[in-house]
Each structure stands twice: as C-alpha cells, then as structure tokens.
Amino acid sequence: MASRHHILLINGPNLNLLGTREPQIYGSTTLHDIEQAAQTQASSLDLRLTTFQSNHEGAIIDRIHQAAGFFPSPSGPATIAEADPGAGEKVSAIIINPGAYTHTSVGIRDALLGTGIPFVEVHVSNVHAREAFRHHSYLSDKAVAVICGLGPYGYSAALEFVGRHMKF
C-alpha cells in the first residue's frame, strides 16, 4: 500500500484562544475541536495530518523548514521536534492560518517559498470585511488557494481540497 500524504496544519498567533476570543467574530469552536475534526477528516481522506500552533513567528518559520526536512541551527531551540513527533518529516502540503502574521510576516512567506511546499491559506473570519489593515496578505499571491470567512468549516474545505484536488 502506498504511503499516505503527510499534511501539516499550522495555526499562528492567538488561534489557541479560539472559542473564547471574540466569539462574535471567530465563533465558539476551539482550536482543539478544529484539530480533532481535521484529524478525523484527514483519516477519511487517507491523509496523515500533523498539527502545530505557535504564537511565535520564529517557531512557525522553523516548523515550515522542518516540514521540508531542514532543521534550525544547533544554537536554536530544539523544542519543536520534542513537542511535535511529525517535525522533520517531509510533508506534501501545508494548510496555514497565519493569524495576524498574514499581514506582517515576510519571514513566513519566505519560509513557505523557500521550501517549495504547496500551501493553502485559511482564515476563520472574512478578513476583507474587517479592518483595512487585515485586507493585505503576504501569502495569498503564492498560495494554491485562499479560504476565508467560512468559520471552522474553512479548515474542512482546505483539507477536502488538498485531499481530493491537489496533485502531489
């Protein structure tokens, strides 16, 4: 049997607060709920899913590098590999909700482009219906797809797209 494609789901800053942070915008579903549903769905699509969340830009960049088999320098933190058993295992695609780093992080953009791993950008809220500073994304012009405003279902839509429509 062929090995399943490995997908990495990355969530950025403040997404660990889903379910309690501004529920009128983000809803009441927790990140844990989203990750559990994503694991179930990934299994049904014969995908292997690893999840990762960090409030720190450098940790997200390191995790993207690890997804391509690159590791941080020995002087850098080793905590990601210890906390994430999938770290360092090459992945076929990344689904990323970069949170506020969407609008600020050239570093995350460069990490995604530098690894060459195709990625889907996801946002729980419709960023285009919010404050003007949220309208610009440093990632969307390079993403295979962008999903926003669907609430937690956006993650499901991203996994469905990756599992059924992406060519690896």
Curated annotation (Swiss-Prot):
The keyword Iron-sulfur is annotated on this UniProt entry: no
InterPro entries in the record: DHquinase_II, DHquinase_II_CS, DHquinase_II_sf
Site label Transition state stabilizer, positions: 21
UniProt record, GO biological process: 3,4-dihydroxybenzoate biosynthetic process; quinate catabolic process
Chain residues that bind substrate: 97, 103, 110, 124-125, 134
Alphabetical keyword list: Lyase, Quinate metabolism
EC number(s) from the headed UniProt entry: 4.2.1.10
Reactions it catalyzes: 3-dehydroquinate = 3-dehydroshikimate + H2O
Metabolic or biological pathway: Aromatic compound metabolism; 3,4-dihydroxybenzoate biosynthesis; 3,4-dihydroxybenzoate from 3-dehydroquinate: step 1/2
Disulfide bonds: none
Active site: 26 (proton acceptor), 123 (proton donor)
UniProt GO MF annotations: 3-dehydroquinate dehydratase activity
Subunit organization: Homododecamer. Adopts a ring-like structure, composed of an arrangement of two hexameric rings stacked on top of one another.
Family of this protein: Belongs to the type-II 3-dehydroquinase family.
Biological role stated in the UniProt entry: Is involved in the catabolism of quinate. Allows the utilization of quinate as carbon source via the beta-ketoadipate pathway.
Protein name stated in the entry: Catabolic 3-dehydroquinase
Organism of provenance: Neurospora africana
Taxon lineage: Eukaryota, Fungi, Dikarya, Ascomycota, Pezizomycotina
